[in-house]
Swiss-Prot record:
Its main location: cytoplasm. Belongs to the TRAFAC class TrmE-Era-EngA-EngB-Septin-like GTPase superfamily. TrmE GTPase family. It is found in: Cytoplasm. PROSITE patterns: G_TRME. NCBIfam families: mnmE_trmE_thdF, PRK05291.1-3, small_GTP. This is tRNA modification GTPase MnmE.
Length: 448
């Protein structure tokens, strides 16, 4: 990083009241600031108890000051942490004192961004910080910690090292074109490429599982009015999150709920009827429902077996994207017998279900996990993001193209290897555009 980097400060603990509140400061040569804050010269990595004072020497609070000298800190710069009482007024006064002493307010994720830019973390590890904070289940937290501790990064670095080794082998032959084929055959370049492809496939499979655990499955409930969509949402959520009445059209807006199935987040939207209406409020809800449908991975199509697919249901089905996966739900199975087979909704799976008794809910949950592609938490998994999966798919594609190169296409072979390396490097931040970094770190919380 440049030497002209400003000192930054932020509250590092959650907003609101608490037993302890933490102010984090990062920059260069922070000892004078530490002395101004507490009237003492702190020793690195030693907790110093002191009064934190304002510009007039009046105590704002008392607590612990921790000083971490560069480069042995989270950000790689000098870092100060003030641990005081966790009231919002006290935290605000302490933060303002830091700003008076020359710091500026940190942007979201700026501490972690500095850690990345100072080579304390790679990009996958930095994302692991945010994913650990945002984890929605114990499984997600465990896998995010693995990413933060470098499990994912080590797999990627191993791929990159093997790619570099193979590239050096292939590119060296370009200087001796008359011997290239024999040289590559003797070095088993094709065998090494096959091994690389298998390794990428393995990391990709793990990354896809990690992405499922982080990002989950988007599900929409669709069907004719009063067919039981809201009742099913309540049954899945285990709570009254949607109003249930016998009046058709009760749901005038999309109702959203997140549930966990074996640690996998499932984002469910109970759609307002996908129909035309003159009601302004209902029309807004229908537009939101259409947006939810466009973003969905799976549609649960609710059908009353006594009526089958009526005109209203058919109109809803026609409004669904043809490629959207569908599960046909025969609702209210406690009131009538389950109809054999489906009703031509385009679904491969049909489940009879009663939201009232719970019959069929477990079968539906298992089906949703299968649709998500979740295979269960196993050894070697780590939390991953869609961008990681896409980068690994790009590397996989480049290696497949390299495998198609003939014996006299050495330059093309080498280029595909280079592009595969670039794709892998995007995961750890070795090859990453500044605008992508801005997007990634802007989604962190302030103070991290």
């Amino acid at each position: 990083m440049s030497d002209n980097v400003p000192t930054i400060a932020a509250v590092a603990t959650a907003p609101g009241r608490g037993g302890v509140g933490v102010i984090r400061i990062s920059g260069k040569n922070l000892l004078p600031m530490a002395e101004a804050l507490c009237g003492k010269t702190p020793k690195p990595r030693v907790a110093t108890y002191a009064d934190f004072t304002d510009a007039d020497g009046q105590a704002i609070d008392s607590g612990l000051l921790l000083f971490f000298a560069a480069p042995a800190s989270f950000t790689g710069e000098d870092v100060i942490e003030l641990q005081g009482h966790g009231g919002p007024v006290v935290m605000d006064m302490l933060l303002n004192r830091c700003l008076e002493l020359g710091a500026r307010l940190a942007e979201p994720g700026e501490f972690t961004k500095r850690a990345f830019l100072n080579d304390k973390l790679d990009l996958a590890q930095a994302e692991g910080v945010a994913d650990l904070i945002d984890a929605s289940s114990r499984s997600a937290a465990r896998l995010a910690l693995r990413s933060l501790k470098g499990d994912f990064s080590r797999r990627i670095h191993g791929l990159v090292e093997d790619l570099i080794t193979l590239r050096m082998l292939v590119e060296a032959t370009l200087d001796f074109p008359e011997e290239d084929i024999d040289f590559l055959e003797a070095a088993d370049a094709r065998g090494k490429l096959d091994g690389l492809r298998r390794a990428v496939d393995d990391v990709l499979a793990n990354a896809q599982q990690g992405a499922i655990l982080r990002e989950g499955l988007n599900v929409v409930l669709v069907g004719a009015p009063n067919v039981g969509k809201s009742s099913l949402l309540n049954a899945l959520a285990g709570d009254e999150v949607a109003i249930v009445t016998d009046i058709a059209g009760t749901t005038r807006d999309a109702v959203r709920e997140r549930i966990l199935i074996d640690g996998v987040p499932v984002h469910i939207v109970d759609t307002a009827g996908l129909r035309e209406t003159d009601d302004v409020v209902e029309r807004i809800g229908i537009e939101r429902s259409r947006k939810a449908v466009s973003e969905a991975d799976v549609a649960l199509v609710l059908v009353d077996p006594r009526e089958g697919v009526n005109d209203k249901t058919r109109a809803i089905l026609d409004a669904l994207p043809p490629e959207l996966k569908r599960i046909e739900i025969h609702s209210k199975s406690d009131l009538h017998a389950h109809a054999a087979g489906g009703f031509g909704t385009g679904a491969e799976t049909v489940i009879a279900l009663s939201a009232k008794t719970g019959d069929g809910l477990d079968a539906l949950k298992r089906t949703l996990l299968r649709e998500a592609g979740w295979q269960g938490e196993g050894e070697g998994l780590f939390l991953a993001r869609t961008r990681h999966v896409n980068a690994l798919k790009a590397a996989q594609e480049e290696l497949s193209l390299a495998a198609l190169c003939g014996n006299h296409q050495i330059e093309l072979f080498a280029e595909h290897l280079r592009l595969a390396q670039v794709a892998c490097g995007e995961i750890t931040g070795e090859f990453t555009a500044d605008d992508l970094l801005g997007v990634i770190f802007s989604r962190f919380c302030i103070g991290k």
